[in-house]
Amino acid sequence: MAKIYFIAGEMSGDFIGGRIIQHLKNNTGVQFVGVGSKYMEEAGSFKSLFPISAINLIGFVEILPHILKLKKLIDKTVEDIINSKADLLITIDSPGFTYRVAKQVRKLLPKLKMIHIVAPSVWAYKEGRAIKYAKIYDCLFAVLPFESPYFTKVGLDCRYIGHPIMEQEFYSDKIALRKEFKIDENEKVLCVTLGSRRGEILRHLPVFIASIEEIFESCKNLKVIFTLVNPANEVIIKPFLENVKFNYLFSSERLKTYALSDLALAKSGTNTLEIAASGTPMIVAYKVNILSFLIIRALIKIKYVTLINIIAGSEIIPEFIQHNCRATLISNKLQELLFSSKKAYKQVIESQKILQKLRFKSNQLPSYIAAEIIKQEFLEPKIKL
């Protein structure tokens, strides 16, 4: 029986891993072990080596206080991979952790086959990372259509599989969803996404609340839904809402929330693709530690942070980044989209066109394409087909 060691450092990676495992375990004799969360554990019937929240870090500076803890987790993971006697190592995104693990494993197990899923954003900054990945990995699965040439030119086998956003099932019946959430017909719904990390939430929450307070003055029928990636984050957010004037509620059913909303105020990230795919207009705001920002600004080669804008080469979705992440600027744009259906509709239509570019040309699911490559090219001699 073949054995695959998976590593995912975030929930988005865990989702990808879980979907691939579901395809791999059909009609194959494969055992799964590694580091992941609910999707991978459930699909692969294994217990994660440790909770992925332990490695869910962000930023250049923010990671420094956790460097010793991170090193211990890297060493622990490397040791577990060696002891597992796995036939294949698959790492997913989270390059700050997964690359360091893979680099050590390559030194200790030079013959072990290794695949990485979700290419590092070398098109945005540090293009030299492509060479580093070529020295470590046997194959790379890219999720954006323009990424492969950056890696193939340095000798790394890179396959475009399509974006995982195409795996999601999105809701379209806004009326039914609003009834389910007990939203009145005359209410304007603004959904707010703050991310999953405590630091991100605390950094964005004050300016987001101030922005909402400003638009509430001209939109008394506003209802705000805070979407929770982790339900436990409600206790972080609630103290900030004690004296607000607007009505609000919490929801961990993010895809339903995106679909029923009139507008979204979103932290930059994968959530912006989900909101766009739900047919909801949005504004994106984001800021990081000032030292992290200075480092990023010196390295980065792109004008936008939202993937839809990056692919389009223009600002389809309004962005308010770092020093522009201010309540007055954000609230003005929120009001503009909330009360101008024409502008909101235009954003939705243009976003949908960009999303179609993330779909594999055969319309096959990314996880299915990935699983087929893994089975046929990396595991075939060891599994029962």
UniProtKB/Swiss-Prot annotation:
Reaction catalysed by this enzyme: a lipid X + a UDP-2-N,3-O-bis[(3R)-3-hydroxyacyl]-alpha-D-glucosamine = a lipid A disaccharide + UDP + H(+)
Listed under GO cellular component are: membrane
Pathway assigned to this chain's UniProt record? Bacterial outer membrane biogenesis; LPS lipid A biosynthesis
The protein's UniProt keywords, in alphabetical order, are: Glycosyltransferase, Lipid A biosynthesis, Lipid biosynthesis, Lipid metabolism, Transferase
Matching entries from Pfam families are given as: LpxB (PF02684)
Give the Gene Ontology MF terms in alphabetical order.
lipid-A-disaccharide synthase activity; phospholipid binding
- Which EC number applies? 2.4.1.182
The answer to whether the entry has keyword Transferase is: yes
* Keyword Lipid metabolism recorded: yes
Q: According to the UniProt record, what class of enzyme is this? A: transferase
Cystine crosslinks: none
Query: What processes in GO biological process is this protein linked to?
Result: lipid A biosynthetic process
Q: Which SUPFAM superfamilies does this UniProt record tie to the protein?
A: UDP-Glycosyltransferase/glycogen phosphorylase
**HAMAP family on file:** LpxB
The job of this chain, per UniProt, is described as: Condensation of UDP-2,3-diacylglucosamine and 2,3-diacylglucosamine-1-phosphate to form lipid A disaccharide, a precursor of lipid A, a phosphorylated glycolipid that anchors the lipopolysaccharide to the outer membrane of the cell.
Similarity annotation:
Belongs to the LpxB family.
Protein name per the record: Lipid-A-disaccharide synthase
